[in-house]
Amino acid sequence: MRLVILTLVLGLVVLTIGAELLVRSASKLAVAAGISPLVVGLTVVAIGTSAPELVVSVQSTWRGQPDVAMGNVVGSNIFNVLLILGISALIIPLRVSQQLIRFDVPLMIGLSALVWGFAWDGRLGRIDGALLVTGLVGYLTLAVWKSRKEQAAVNAEYESEYGATSTISIGGMVLNLLLLVVGLALLVLGARWFVDAAIVLARQLGMSELVIGLTIVAAGTSLPEVATSILAAIRGERDIAVGNVVGSNLFNIMGVLGLSGLVSAQGVTVTDTALQLDIPVMVAVAFACLPIFFTGHLIARWEGVLFLAYYGAYTAYLVTAATVPQFNRTYEFVMLTFVIPPTAITLAVAVVRDARKPAASRTDSESSEM
């Protein structure tokens, strides 16, 4: 057991280092090649934070472990919203931009529901994967087109994170190429160790590969998003903390699940449990973002606590279902009777009250939260 846990942790460390090397070297090479920091930020850097999910899911599907791939994406999306935004909102109430409310969050809801529909026949096939990847290309193209007017701000943000955008020497290019190759190799190696250890751990604990994917693998591969969002909240960059999570979830659905569906002739199989519980939870979590984001365009601290409580409840259900199945009925009854309805009523009242506020008082309320 100790060796398995050590391999799991080591694989995660190698995976994270590989992702960091890949993002930094690819970003500098892209800028040196004349690609604008705006495009780099929307593609290389954004995709880089989800590189662990991508490599783990594609590799798992390729090696005949689709439950890990599906569990990783679904679990990561649930983890990103409930845990990462929950912790970030506890640090400081998070600002939500109009762009997210009007476009990105509805898109996240629609894509989550679309995946549920695709999975209804028990698998995510190559056609489904191709449609999702095509959607990602369209989304990135639209994002680049819409963000060109913010070019100066994006350049400044890129330079503060990755350094000046000046040209680099031949030696610098060779070094970054080597770092790119090393980063990619570490990603693949770390993913192999991480997935292998997770599978062994699941069997030793008597849990399914799906549950391990939804919990340990999902949490581990989401570490770049954890670091980015929490650091942004601490620095007071509250819109970045929210945008990072929503953007990561969109890429997980379109990019990670899409490519996972493409690499296997059989596609990504979807278990009845995932179809009846975990994917609906992902859809519900995405949908819950809309009323919470809408109220004052802020995620308040009490809403952060609510997110954390629900993630704890969901994780507890997964663990009890795998280890003490006789408690499932009681747990479901308590959640459906005493927890979910009061929460839904509270959110509905908050939305109605916020909608009835005059614009001036709403602005004052936002200022008092800051």
Describe each model-derived feature in a short phrase:
Residues 1-370:
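Hydrophobic alpha-helical segments, chiefly the membrane-spanning helices
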